[in-house]
Regions:
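Short hydrophobic segments within beta-strands
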Residues: 7-9, 36, 113
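Residues at the starts of beta-strands that form the adenosine-phosphate
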Residues: 3, 31-34, 66
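Histidine-anchored nucleotide/phosphate-binding helix
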Residues: 15-30
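Short, glycine-rich nucleotide/cofactor-binding loops
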Residues: 4-17, 42-48
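Mid-chain, well-packed structural core segment of small domains
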Residues: 49-90
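Anion (oxyanion) recognition and catalysis
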Residues: 27-28, 61, 84, 104
Length: 113
């Protein structure tokens, strides 16, 4: 089974939604899929649940596809408490940021958004 890790960095909702759409698409097609939320995209954690794509966000969360939210970036963007409230996996293994190396080691192809 192929493994895909999608890393969302951009802070625009349209870019984040495209990352979500692709994560779900790969998941539905049988890929082992991971979503890593980094950089400015962590700012959107407060907005996405009540957005037009909130239902998709809920499905992705329920399926356990969100594997990492950058602790340093979420703190900088003011959404760390929101990430914790949503029960998202917080990662600070790389000097406070999400560590991509374990995904590479585990054979994931990494796609950046």
């Amino acid at each position: 089974m192929r493994k895909i890790a999608i890393v969302s960095f951009q802070g625009e909702m349209s870019c984040f939604v495209h990352a979500l759409l692709n994560v779900w698409n790969y998941h539905e097609r049988g890929y082992e899929t991971a979503l890593i939320i980094e950089g400015a995209s962590t700012r959107l954690l407060s907005d996405i649940p009540n957005s037009p794509k909130g239902e998709l966000w809920g499905k992705i969360k329920e399926a356990g596809l969100i594997k990492s939210v950058c602790k340093a970036c979420a703190a900088q963007m003011g959404t760390l408490q929101e990430a914790e409230k949503q029960g998202l996996p917080i990662d600070s293994a790389l000097s406070g940021h999400s560590d991509l190396e374990p995904f590479s080691r585990d054979g994931y192809e990494i796609i950046l958004f």
